[in-house]
Amino acid sequence: VSRDGRPIALQLEDEPRPMPGREVFERVLVLDEAKNFFTFVNVDAEPVPSLLRGFSAPVILAEPLSDDDLLVLLKHDSDAFNRWEAGQRLALNRLLGAIRGEREPVLDDAFIDAMRSVLRHPQLDPAFKCLVLSLPDENLLAEQLDSVNPQRIHAVREVMQGQLAQAHTAGVEDGVGDRRRDGRRRAFTDRLDVVRPDAVLGLEQ
């Protein structure tokens, strides 16, 4: 996808250029060697790769995506799993940084704005919105740490989840729908406790 969320036509080198309206925006690449190289041509915008779309096997892909790349995927990717995964990776980076004391336990505006775009998307399923807006759980966070402090992990996660709740309260009814009509739609706002950031700052790392 492009950085403004537009799908980019995919034409491999040595392929004829497709006629207007016959472009291909997704394709399967066969990896049958230890190393495979593919060159795309006539790429009309800076791309952000959305890989393994629709893939069902449990594969962990090592890809050098930056925070800016992940924010693009979170806001615009049409593949549900890739969109969710981008949000989880962004949240994980922020949570782990705060737990390790490398950053304040405060979510940045870019992340909150990207989450807001998910919440306000008119075509996304409400249950999927709740899933995307949920931060990685405490067990996953603990697995990423060399030294585990359960109290700090819990406190940092609660603070950041509370910040998401506060930031998006105004858009919940429009984005998630009438919670009285569908209990699934309560999953995001009803379980979020707003915790003060200073509750974390006093904890030892």
Regions found by a protein language model. Name each.
Residues 1-22:
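Polar, glycine-rich mid-to-C-terminal structural blocks
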Residues 19-26, 138-139:
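A broadly tuned preference for mixed-charge, low-complexity surface segments
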Residues 22, 28-48:
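A surface-exposed beta-strand-loop module
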Residues 2-3, 7, 39-185, 191, ...:
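Long, ordered, helix-rich scaffold segments
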